[in-house]
Every structure is written in structure tokens, then in C-alpha cells.
Amino acid sequence: MKKEEIVRETVGAPAHGKAVRFLLAVSLLVIPGVARAADAGPDPGPAPAPTPAPVAQDAAAKADAGPRLDIYGFAMLDMGYQTKQNDPNWFDVVRPTKLPAFKDQYGEDGHFYAGVRQSRLGVKGFIPTEAGEIKTIFEFELFGTGVDAGQTTFRLRHAWGELGQVGAGQTWSPFMDPDVFLNSIEYWGPTGMVFFRNVQLRWTPWQKGDSRFAIALERPGASADQGDFAGRIALQDVKGRFPLPDLSAQYRHAAGWGHVQLAGIVRQMKWDDLNTDQFDLSGDATGWGLNLSSNIKIAKKHVARLSVVYGAGIQNYMNDAPVDVGIERNLGNPRTPIVGKALPLVGVVAFLDLNWNAKWTSTVGYSMIDIDNSDGQSDDAFKRGQYALANLLYYPTPSVFLGPEIQWGKRENFRDGFTSDDFRIQFSAKYNFKLSLGGK
């Protein structure tokens, strides 16, 4: 499928190793106190959630505690065998959009792979003030995307700060529920999940425990598929434009049984025809979506992770989806023979994390995404993706796990009837660390 990128900024860009070492060195000088090691446990969670501004007495008490810096991360090895084939830039993940659109598109079947690209390094800062606690996070990993796809290189995950009800920087979109992500060793995750770290300005006017309401202005972006009209001169000077930020919001209710979250988003996408020919291909589309998600505790130790999302023109917020806008034929209008259409989609996630005991866990489940393609897209355009896995992981200590996982993915094309699938067996080992400096 040939695709024209309008704007699709990747979540983060490579960071030079010297910059990371400089950051750590400065932190050691600025933050007083004695270092103390801590058991990191499982994967460090997402960026800190926004908190309401504390009362003056609480702020003063926290100020007495002094500033603290947490340095954390993990080293992780992935080794596996892929029985089929996919885009070699995505050799170590299961992404249905990167599976072949026609027979043997990426060569012969059967590939062994190994890497450390999931390895991560992060720094969290906590500085008490009279106005409340300033929370910051800088987090990087080694998984290259965008121009660095397929490479082992530093990539920014989070660059985030917050004070009281207001947060700013790059972190999880409020349209997303990061707690839906399962305890797996496959890096990319469920194809039907909303998953996007985005630049944003966020306000959380209400929070009580893990329950909250938040609203954000987010960096816009989208991509388009020219489909059967790719390469036409008339389309060469059609340029995308985003006059407004994306507007997202979430409401989460948390209780002893787990939580339920409803999130929504609305966005404006425009494209301008700069050609002076007989056609006027300028247009616009409104993207929107609703994402209902939940964690449900079962027998006090197992967790069901569930979500369903529906909308149109929100593909760049999805974990694995192709384009936000497709071509629709409008041949009855000689001035505007084609128009752009925000593509509708539905995505589903259903996984079960099983915690057998302190040493053993398993995860099993399924995810899918389905696109309502436009009639101007090519026959081999991406239509539907499916994803499933099961694993058994062993924890010799809370900071270390290792174990195998079986992984499966499938791609279905729009009109030509072609399908391709992926089956893998992967083994991973992960070693967490955490060091706290300062505080009392």
C-alpha cells in the first residue's frame, strides 16, 4: 500500500548517550543525600498521574522531606524464532500492519532474531515546594522508530513535569489507558489498543485516589492513503494542515475491584490544494473517538485487562493502524472528483494476567482492529489486524523475570482477499534496577 504522510511525528526522537550521562552527573551534584538501593520490581509504570494541589500544611510537611531523585530502568534480552516474515525494520515485534500485503513481499519465511531494544533508562524527580510537589520524569528506551526504525538507539518516551493540577510535556495521552497493557514480553502490544505518548498540556481538576477527571490539548498529526490515485500529478501539491490542537479527556472511576475509564477525543484535519489546475482537492475531516477500558480483579490476584474503542480518523492514536484519511470517489463532481474521508475503526482488547504465586505468572488474550476502508483505497490496503499471545514467566526475585511466549498476528487486505499471518516463539530475560537519591 502506498501512503502519503501528512504529519505523523513519532513519539520521541533519538537522544545522544552523552546527554543522558550529563543529566545523571548533574543530578548527582544537585540532589543532596545518601544513595540507597531499592528493589525495582516489575516494569516501572507510566509517568506520574496528575494530583490536586495540596493544602498548605501538607505542602510544608513535604518540603521538610527534601528533594528526591529516582534513577530506574532495566536491561532486557529478547530472542526468538519467526516462522513467517514481516517488514525487516520491525523484525522483533508483532505488528499486523507490517505483515506482507502480497505473497513473499519480504522474502522467504523463517527468521531468528535477538536484541536488547526494550532496555530502558529513566529519571524521576520530586521537589517539595510551598505550592506543592514538582514531579518530573525523563525516560528513554533503545527501540528505534521513524527514521531509526529497526535500529538500537535512544528514543524519548517521557519528558514530563507537573505541579498540582497542571502537567506539561510528553507522556501518555488522556485518550489512552496504560493499565490495559498486559504483562507480556512482546514489545509492541495489542493491535486494537489506544496507545500513544504525545506532547500535551493537561489539566486535572479532580482526583481522589486513582479516580480522576483530566482534559488535555495535544499535538495534532495524521496520515493519508492516496490509494488508487497515488502518483497523480493533481495530488502532488496537496498539503496537510492542522489549525487546532487535538482535544482529549478522560474520566476514571477506581474501586477495590479495579477501575473503569471512559475517554474521548476530537480533532480537526485539513488539506490544501496548492495546484492551479482545473481541480480543487482541498478539504477537511473531523476525527473523533470514544475509548472504554477497564481492569477487573479476579480472585484478588488475577487481572482482566479490557478495552473497546470506536471512532474515525484516530488511527495515529492506535497502537497499530495505518492511515487516518482515505480517498473517496466523487466522480459526479468534475471540479472535485475525489474527497478525503476520515476512516472509521473499531478496536478490541481482552487479556487476562494470571499471578499464580510470587514466582510464576502467565498472560493470555486476544486483540483486533477493523478499518472501514474508503472506496478509493487500493485493493491491498490494510483492512483488519488480529493479535494474540500466551506466556509463562518466572521471577527468581521481584526484580528479575525470564520465560517463553508464543505470539501470533494476522493481516487481512481490503478487497483482493489476501491474508498473511505471523507466528513466533520468543524467550526474554529482564533485569530491573532502581536507585533513590536524596529525600529523608
Feature map (PLM): residue ranges:
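Cleavable N-terminal export/targeting peptides
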Residues: 1-57, 437-440
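Outer-membrane beta-barrel proteins
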Residues: 82-86, 147-149, 177-181, 222-227, ...
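Outer-membrane beta-barrel "beta-signal"
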Residues: 396, 420-440
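Outer membrane beta-barrel
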Residues: 58-226, 241-259, 295-299, 303-316
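Transmembrane beta-strand segments that form the barrel wall of outer-membrane beta-barrel proteins
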Residues: 133-144, 219, 263-268, 361-374, ...
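Extracytoplasmic loops and strand-loop junctions of Gram-negative outer membrane beta-barrel proteins
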Residues: 54-57, 101-108, 183-187, 230-235, ...
